[in-house]
Curated annotation (Swiss-Prot):
PANTHER family: RIBOSOME-BINDING FACTOR A, CHLOROPLASTIC-RELATED. GO terms for cellular component: cytosol. This is Ribosome-binding factor A. Gene3D superfamilies: 3.30.300.20. It comes from Neisseria gonorrhoeae (strain ATCC 700825 / FA 1090). PROSITE patterns: RBFA. Belongs to the RbfA family. Keywords: Cytoplasm, Ribosome biogenesis. GO terms for biological process: maturation of SSU-rRNA. It is found in: Cytoplasm.
Length: 123
């Protein structure tokens, strides 16, 4: 007999938990002053929980490359801290990727505004 579906899958709950904990760890646990203001936007995990891709943005675009280096350097420490906060059989290996969706959205919005400004208004 098939189990009834819950509204929220376990994998989704784990992703949300990892995202919350990483956001807190990045905010309080990164001691490197070179890191900019980092926002964790999304976490994607594999079905076997062995890998997690963490999508992030930074407030100041000038610190983007430095922040990437800082996150890669702190990857092991962040994974270790996650293992203390989250009880999982396997803590996923973390992969950090800059989230360009916000920039793409802003450029698309600018293109739409440009086309709208060029098109004459008809009554």
């Amino acid at each position: 007999m098939k189990k009834p579906q819950r509204g929220y899958a376990r994998q989704d709950r784990v992703k949300e938990q990892i995202m919350r904990e990483l956001a807190e760890l990045v905010r309080t646990g990164l001691k490197d002053p070179r890191a900019g203001f980092i926002t964790i936007n999304e976490v994607e995990i594999t079905r076997d929980y062995s890998h997690a891709t963490v999508f992030y943005t930074v407030l100041n675009q000038d610190t983007r490359e430095i922040t990437e280096e800082v996150l890669e350097h702190a990857r092991g420490h962040l994974r270790s801290e996650l293992s203390k906060r989250i009880k999982l059989f396997k803590i996923p290996e973390l992969h950090f990727k800059y989230d360009e969706s916000l920039e793409r959205g802003m450029s698309l919005s600018a293109l739409i505004d440009q086309v709208a400004a060029e098109k004459p208004v008809e009554d």
